[in-house]
A protein has these predicted regions:
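Short, structured coil segments at secondary-structure junctions
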Residues: 73, 124-126, 184, 202-204, ...
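Adenosine-phosphate binding glycine-rich loop
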Residues: 260-261, 266-316
Length: 316
């Protein structure tokens, strides 16, 4: 993505998105949240436009969030998965993309287990491609909604100590947050087991810790990642009990952070493993608000990439 209007541009990740573009999306998301909170959530901003949610991996939050985002904006939205399409009959990924393109689809929101699948799609077909998570690569809209959630509680992201805790190695959420937060001026700290948080990550402008207490000390934000048990080799991971004891976030550890610390989690949570239930549902937690904010942020992304503008034209 370059600077200026986002109309017609793909959102594949935050690595190549400018701080100005991030600010644009977050500012428009503020207006979209007013729609989300209103009694009449249906607006005609994308009337006549068609969006396909092509999810090759299971999803509850992201797919539902994108579906509601499109429908709230007045678009026609279709959800596709391998089991519910000709992909289940052996149709190739490329042919599926071509079919959707020939039908006149305006945008394809895509989740895929293969890193780089959304980039491939941009070279194969014409519709706007929005990455809803590709392997362990990136998940840009999750990072955008995380930053939006921070800005609702803090005046600015610049200068904040943001701790990302857990399975960094397998986390597309972590990568997008690292790219986005560092561009917005945050001091990003990563923490977790040595098998999941490599020192080489410091090349991205972050600080790496293998002691959770050291990492959380004086933190403004603690973003706890889900332990992706389905992706983890046993050699990389201790027992659940050991992980919870050493790296799980609980009230005892959270006391080391600032008094107004925010606790975040992209979901779904493994309560009692990476995060204690009393922390997940504490006053410091904004986890449920993240879900609501996700709809507003994805509305902003769909509007800006399909229609363009800078938000000043929106009467909300």
């Amino acid at each position: 993505m370059g600077q200026g209007s986002l109309k017609g541009k793909h959102l594949l990740g935050l690595q190549n998105v400018s701080p100005e573009e991030i600010k644009l999306i977050l500012n428009v998301a503020k207006k979209m949240k007013k729609i989300v909170l209103s009694d009449d959530k249906k607006v005609p901003l994308l009337k006549g436009k068609s969006i396909v949610n092509l999810f090759m991996e299971p999803s509850t939050r992201t797919r539902s969030s994108f579906e509601l985002a499109g429908k709230y904006l007045g678009a026609d939205v279709i959800n596709l998965s391998p089991s519910g399409s000709s992909m289940g009959k052996g149709e190739s990924f490329r042919d599926t993309l071509l079919t959707l393109s020939y039908m006149g689809t305006d945008a394809i929101v895509m989740r895929h287990s293969a890193e780089g699948a959304p980039l491939y799609a941009t070279k194969a077909v014409d519709p706007i491609i929005i990455n809803a998570g590709d392997g362990a690569h990136e998940h840009p809209t999750q990072a955008l909604l995380d930053m939006y959630s921070i800005l609702e509680k803090k005046e600015s992201i610049e200068g904040l100590k943001v701790v990302i805790l857990g399975d960094i190695m397998h986390s597309r959420v972590a990568r997008s947050n690292i790219y986005g937060l560092t561009k917005m001026g945050a001091k990003v700290h990563l923490a977790g087991p040595r098998t999941m948080v490599y020192p080489e990550l410091e090349k991205l402008g972050v600080t790496v810790h293998h002691d959770i207490r050291e990492a959380v000390a004086d933190a403004d934000v603690v973003n706890v990642l889900r332990i992706q048990l389905e992706r983890i080799h046993s050699a990389l991971y201790p027992t659940n009990r050991e992980y919870a004891r050493i790296f799980g976030i609980n009230n005892d550890v959270l006391k080391l952070a600032k008094d107004d610390v925010m606790v975040m989690h992209p979901g779904p949570m493994n309560r009692g493993l990476e995060i204690a239930p009393d922390v997940a549902y504490s006053d410091q937690s904004v986890i449920q608000e993240q879900v609501r904010n996700g709809v507003a942020v994805r509305m902003a992304v769909l509007y800006l990439t399909i229609i363009g503008g800078d938000g000043s034209e929106l009467a909300y």
